[in-house]
């Protein structure tokens, strides 16, 4: 995924899709692995639960931002996109996310961890059945080369900031969600994503002040 010379809000869409896709894949594979083998350490269980909670929070906030801000704006610019279908798919995902929340809390607190992980794995796989076709539609209709020419650079930048702030307000806690966002991207993409955050977040809060709180998630994140 290359960064264009000019701002392009569609590139933000691709990056958040990459973050969520990796989060889904990691949570799915690890839930199956730990259901079979158990958690090697208590800290691994804590980290997995934090990672799964962050995944749910980020996906929920992303779809709220699309429903409430992005799609109403883009309907005027790209009227042929299947917005009603995409919103209906979001609603399907909301119901599954509710199930994932329940299963994650069972993993966090319940004594039957293997059974809870197996149930979580089933629900995560059902997310994947909707998620992958869903983002395929979005990325076809809202490709950077289509969205880029529709808006001046300042408007791309304004929307990028608006969408990011809306997602931030609807997700959390920040000390888990921000590292989840940054470190589910490879380093070359992380650089571009981090530029949209305040320096105090990327240079002080994440690496220093929040470090102990998100450290248990480290095994599930990219270096």
Per-segment meaning from a language model:
Residues 1-223:
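Small-residue-biased structural context
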């Amino acid at each position: 995924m290359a960064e264009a010379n000019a701002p392009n809000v569609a590139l933000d869409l691709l990056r958040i899709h990459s973050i969520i896709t990796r989060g889904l894949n990691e949570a799915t594979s690890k839930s199956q692995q730990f259901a079979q083998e158990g958690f090697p350490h208590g800290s691994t269980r804590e980290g997995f639960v934090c990672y799964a909670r962050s995944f749910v929070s980020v996906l929920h906030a992303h779809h709220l931002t699309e429903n409430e801000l992005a799609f109403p704006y883009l309907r005027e610019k790209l009227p042929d996109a299947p917005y009603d279908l995409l919103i209906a798919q979001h609603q399907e995902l909301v119901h599954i996310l509710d199930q994932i929340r329940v299963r994650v809390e069972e993993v966090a607190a319940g004594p039957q961890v293997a059974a809870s992980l197996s149930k979580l794995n089933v629900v995560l796989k059902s997310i994947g059945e909707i998620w992958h076709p869903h983002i395929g539609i979005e990325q076809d209709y809202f490709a950077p080369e289509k969205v880029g020419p529709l808006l001046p650079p300042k408007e791309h930048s304004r929307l990028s900031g608006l969408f990011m702030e809306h997602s931030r307000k609807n997700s959390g806690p920040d000390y888990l969600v921000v590292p989840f966002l940054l470190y589910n991207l490879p380093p070359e993409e992380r650089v571009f994503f981090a530029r949209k955050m305040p320096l105090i977040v990327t240079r002080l809060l994440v690496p220093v002040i929040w470090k102990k709180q998100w450290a248990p998630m480290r095994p599930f994140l990219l270096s």
